[in-house]
C-alpha cells in the first residue's frame, strides 16, 4: 500500500467535480483509505493535541448514529446534538478553529452562553474561530447520513478549514457512516474503527475477559432474541437454585434503556 500524508493531500477536489472518485461505502478500498487517514491521527495525537498554541481545526459531528426506529421513541432527539457543545471549550486555545455541524441550527443565545464560559478568551475572539453549519433537516436520520447526502455541505466543511492546518473529526459515536464521512472529507476520525466496535460491546467485553482468564459474573453473551434470553436465564437458574435475580443487558439502545432486572422465581 502506498504511503499517504494528509498534510500533502489535505484538500481533495471539489465535491461537485465528477472526476473525483471515492471508494464505495463500506468497501475494502474505503477501509484501506480510512486506515491511512488514521495514521495521521497518531501524529496529531502525539504532537498537535498537547500543543496549546498549535494551529488546528476540530470538525465536530455530534451524530447520534443509532437505529432510526429507536430514535422515533425519543422526543426532541435532534437536540442530543447539543450535548457536544461542551467541546466549544477547545476554543480557549487561541489558534484552534472549530467547525460544528448540526441537523438544525442551534439558537445563537445557546452558543453565546458557551462562548462566554471560555477562560481568558473573549466571546468575540472565539466566535471568529467558530463555524456553525446545519443541514436544516430535523428528521430522525442520523446527522452523518444527512451530511453524506449533501455534497455542497461537505464542500462548506472543507472550505471552513484554514489552509495547511491539521484537522480531524470528532463524533458522538462511530459507525460505518462516520468512516465514510471521514474518507469523503479526507480527515482522520478521533474515534474507534467501526470494525472494532464489537470488542467494546457488552458481549465483546465478556469474551475478552474469558479469553484472558479474568473473573466475571456468570452469564451468557451473544444472545439474539427472546428465546436465547429465556434459555440463558433457565441455564443460570439450573446452575444455581438460590439465584433470585439476573440482569439482562441490551447492547444497542439508549442510555436509560440498557438494563432490565429480571426476577427468577
Regions found by a protein language model. Give the residues of each.
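ATP-binding N-terminal substructure of ATP-dependent carboxylate-amine bond-forming enzymes
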Residues: 2-207
Amino acid at each position: 500500500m502506498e504511503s499517504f500524508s494528509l498534510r500533502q493531500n489535505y484538500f481533495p477536489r471539489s465535491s461537485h467535480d465528477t472526476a473525483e472518485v471515492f471508494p464505495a461505502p463500506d468497501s475494502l478500498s474505503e477501509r484501506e483509505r480510512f486506515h491511512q487517514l488514521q495514521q495521521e491521527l497518531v501524529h496529531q495525537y502525539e504532537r498537535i493535541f498537547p500543543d496549546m498554541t498549535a494551529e488546528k481545526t476540530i470538525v465536530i459531528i455530534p451524530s447520534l448514529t443509532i437505529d432510526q426506529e429507536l430514535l422515533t421513541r425519543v422526543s426532541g432527539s435532534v437536540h442530543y446534538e447539543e450535548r457536544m457543545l461542551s467541546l466549544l471549550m477547545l476554543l480557549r486555545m487561541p489558534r484552534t478553529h472549530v467547525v460544528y455541524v448540526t441537523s438544525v441550527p442551534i439558537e445563537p443565545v445557546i452558543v453565546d452562553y458557551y462562548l462566554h464560559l471560555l477562560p481568558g478568551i473573549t466571546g468575540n475572539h472565539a466566535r471568529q474561530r467558530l463555524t456553525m453549519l446545519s443541514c436544516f433537516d430535523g428528521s430522525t436520520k442520523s446527522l452523518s447520513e444527512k451530511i453524506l447526502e449533501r455534497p455542497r455541505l461537505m464542500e462548506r466543511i472543507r472550505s471552513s478549514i484554514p489552509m495547511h492546518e491539521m484537522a480531524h473529526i470528532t463524533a458522538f459515536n462511530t459507525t460505518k457512516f462516520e468512516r465514510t464521512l471521514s474518507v469523503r472529507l479526507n480527515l482522520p476520525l478521533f474515534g474507534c474503527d467501526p470494525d472494532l466496535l464489537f470488542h467494546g460491546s457488552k458481549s465483546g467485553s465478556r469474551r475478552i475477559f474469558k479469553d484472558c482468564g479474568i473473573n466475571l459474573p456468570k452469564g451468557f453473551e451473544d444472545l439474539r432474541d427472546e428465546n436465547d434470553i429465556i434459555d440463558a436465564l433457565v441455564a443460570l437458574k439450573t446452575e444455581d437454585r438460590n439465584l433470585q435475580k439476573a440482569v439482562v443487558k441490551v447492547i444497542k439502545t439508549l442510555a436509560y434503556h440498557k438494563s432490565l432486572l429480571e426476577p427468577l422465581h
